[in-house]
Structure formats: C-alpha cells, structure tokens
C-alpha cells in the first residue's frame, strides 16, 4: 500500500495517525506541496483532485481525500461507533473540520509557515484568522465537559480535528484561551499508538 504524502500536511497526517493506531503498514512517497508542476503526471490517474493524501491500495485501487481514507480504514473499528446517531455525529465533525477548520487554520498555517512568501497573503489573513478563532471557540465550547469530540473514546472525529488543531500555533493562532481544546489535544496525544506529525 502506497501513500502519496506530505510530511507537513495535516490532511496527510490524519491518515498516517489512523494507520499507526491500527498498526497497518504502508509505504510513503513524498509529494511537494509548493511545486505542483508534476501533480497531473503523478496523481492524474489516481485522484481527480490531484491532492494529497492519495492512497493506492495493494490491489491497485486508489482513494483520495483524507476523510474518505479515514472512513475506509476506520469503519468497523473502535474509531467509528456502532450507534447510528454517534456515527452521524462523527461525520458531522469530520465535515466541520473540512468546511470550517481546514479552510481557515490550515490555510493560514500554510501561508505563514510553508509558502515561503507569507507577505503575499497578508490582505486575506485577517479574515481567515477571524474564521479560525471562531472555529476554535466552537470546538472549545463543544469539548467543555467532554473528553472526546463524540462519545467516550477516540473516534475519527478526534483524529480529523487533531490534524490541524494541534499545529494551529504555526499559523499564529493562540490556544491559550481554549482550555478544553488544550486538554483534549493532550488527551489525544497520550493515546496508545499515537505518532507525532513529524514521525
């Protein structure tokens, strides 16, 4: 099994984190997230979105999009509840991560820490920062009094949200005001089988 991957991508990290928890071996091929000139040649037949992560299964079939890959491996494991309502809640928070958190926190982090030209994005940054702060407040309010995002144990919702939340500081977001988020990040990082983003 081959994962087309970027070591700095939170979306790729989510997949690596779940595979580590499940003990599933795989090979990695690093894809440059700055220079995209060879994306069509590299991923065109595998992922119409030309994005990482892209996973090629042992039988040659491919999957793109972090959420789809997480669900493929997570469904039927302890990371997806059996209860229908809780399963839907896991999906709700995975969608929240992709529609709200990722477009704000991940984008600013990329601009600031990895683009090599953060000044080019300065006009757009305040609006993205405001959106990211709103996301962090929402997550903090939800986690207040809870150990995990859904239910009483680690699920795909936690893995999906952890990917970019734990590196939000690289984009200039402060987790200081968000005690519940900080406690949850520590809890997720202390789970058996956890691996850091740079592993």
Give the ranges of each region predicted by the language model:
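GST-like domain detector, emphasizing the conserved glutathione-binding G-site
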Residues: 1-8, 13-126, 140
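GST-like fold's C-terminal all-alpha helical module
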Residues: 85, 97-193, 197
């Amino acid at each position: 099994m081959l994962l087309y991957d970027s070591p700095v991508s939170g979306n790729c990290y989510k997949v690596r984190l779940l595979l580590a928890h499940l003990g599933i071996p795989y090979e990695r091929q690093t894809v440059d997230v700055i220079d995209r000139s060879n994306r069509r040649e590299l991923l065109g037949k595998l992922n119409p979105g030309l994005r990482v992560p892209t996973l090629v299964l042992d039988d040659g079939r491919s999957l793109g999009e972090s959420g789809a890959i997480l669900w493929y491996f997570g469904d039927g494991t302890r990371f997806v509840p059996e209860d229908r309502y809780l399963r839907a809640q896991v999906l709700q928070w995975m969608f929240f991560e992709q529609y709200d958190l990722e477009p704000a926190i991940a984008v600013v982090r990329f601009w600031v820490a990895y683009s090599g030209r953060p000044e080019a994005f300065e006009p757009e940054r305040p609006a993205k920062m405001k959106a990211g702060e709103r996301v962090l407040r929402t997550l903090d309010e939800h986690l207040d009094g809870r150990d995990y995002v859904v239910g009483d144990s680690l699920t795909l919702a936690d893995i999906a949200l952890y990917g970019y939340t734990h590196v939000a500081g690289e984009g200039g977001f402060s987790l200081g005001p968000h005690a519940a988020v900080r406690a949850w990040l520590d809890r997720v990082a202390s789970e058996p089988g956890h691996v850091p983003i740079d592993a």
